[in-house]
Amino acid sequence: MNPILSSSSSATNDSVLSPTPIDLINPTIKTMKRFYSKHSTRTYKWRVQQVKAMLTMLTSNMSLFQAALLTDLGKCSVEAQLTEITTMVLECKEVLQKLASWMRSEDVGSPLLLAPAFLEIRFEPRGVCLVIGPFNYPVTLTLGPVISALAAGNPVVIKPSDLCPAVANLLTKLIPTYFDPEVVNVVNGAIPETTELMRNEWGLVFFTGSERVGKIIAGQAAATMSPVVLELGGKSPLIICEDIPEMKAMCNRIIWGKSINAGQTCVAPDYVLCHEKNAEEVLREMKNSLEVMFR
C-alpha cells in the first residue's frame, strides 16, 4: 500500500485536508524513481493504459467531482462539467487518438561526412514529474499536466491546492483505485510539504499559480537543476475599436469571459480600452449583460 495515500485519506470531513507526513514523502519518490529506471513507462502500451485509467476515473466519478467543486468553490454542476470535467475527458480522448503519431521519431538530414549514419529526433520521457495545482481550476489545471506527463511516459506526484480540500481529498481517494502507487501519488499539504517536495530532483516541475510563488518554485527547482514550467497570471486587456457593428454581442462575450469561474481565470478579460465615443455605450451594454446573466 502506498504510505502517502493511506495517510492522506484519513480526513472524515471533505472540507478538512490532512497533510501528508513529511517523512513519507522522500521514500515514496525514491520508490517511483526506481520504478521509472526499469524503463517500462516508455512503451506505447503503458502510456495508453495510464491515459485510459485517467479517462475511466473521470467518467466514472463525474458526480463526485461536481460535488467536490461545489464544496470548494460553490461551482454549479453545469459550470463544473463545462470548465473542469468535460475538458479533461476530451483531453484524454485527444491524447489516445494522437499519441502514436506524437511518439514517432523524426528523421532529420545528416551531413554527407557522416554517411552511412543517419540522424533522428527521439522524444524521451523526462522522469518522475511533480505537478503543483492551483485553486481556481483544481481539476483542469491539475489533471491536465498529469495527463500530459503520463502520455509522455512519466510517473507523477500530484500536489493539489490546499485551498480546495474537497477536490484534494477526492483525488487522494480515487488515484490509488485507478493507478499503481509507483505511477501516480498525491501529496497533500501547504508550504512545508511543498518545500520538502522541492528538495528533490525532478524530471520536470509543472507549477500553476501566482508570480510570487512561481519565483520561489523556480528558485527551488534551480537548486536541484530540475526543469520547471511556470503557468502564471498576467494581464488580458481588451481593445475595442472605434467602429463596432455588434456592440451588444461583444459586451455579452466580455462579461461572460470575465464572470465565468467567478473571474478566476488567468486569461479572463482584465480591463477594457475603447474609443471615447463608445465609452457610454460600452458601459451601458456591459451593465445590461450583467443584469441579464445574473438577475
Task: Identify the role of each PLM range.
Residues 110-178, 182, 225:
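Conserved small-residue-rich beta-alpha loop and adjacent elements
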Residues 1-120:
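N-terminal Rossmann-like NAD(P)+-binding subdomain of aldehyde/semialdehyde dehydrogenases
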Residues 2, 37-56, 192-217, 267-295:
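Aldehyde/semialdehyde dehydrogenase
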Residues 169-176, 191-204, 212-223, 239-245:
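Active-site pre-lysine segment of PLP-dependent enzymes
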Residues 16-19, 212-295:
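ALDH superfamily catalytic-core signature
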Residues 185, 208, 231-233:
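Short beta-strand segments
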Residues 108-116, 186-189, 253-254:
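Short gly/ser/thr-rich secondary-structure transition/capping motifs
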